[in-house]
Amino acid sequence: GCKGFGKACKYGADECCKNLVCSKKHKWCKYTL
């Protein structure tokens, strides 16, 4: 699953984590196993 942290991510948590650029750039987008 995926957890998105912070309001600064303009994408939903799942979409943000699927986007590696976003998830690496924004530390609040994190994967959870």
UniProtKB/Swiss-Prot annotation:
GO terms for molecular function: ion channel inhibitor activity; sodium channel regulator activity; toxin activity. It holds the Pfam family Toxin_12. InterPro entries: Huwentoxin-1, Huwentoxin_CS1. It comes from the Eukaryota. The keyword Secreted applies. One of its GO terms (cellular component) is extracellular region. Belongs to the neurotoxin 10 (Hwtx-1) family. This is Mu-theraphotoxin-Osp1a.
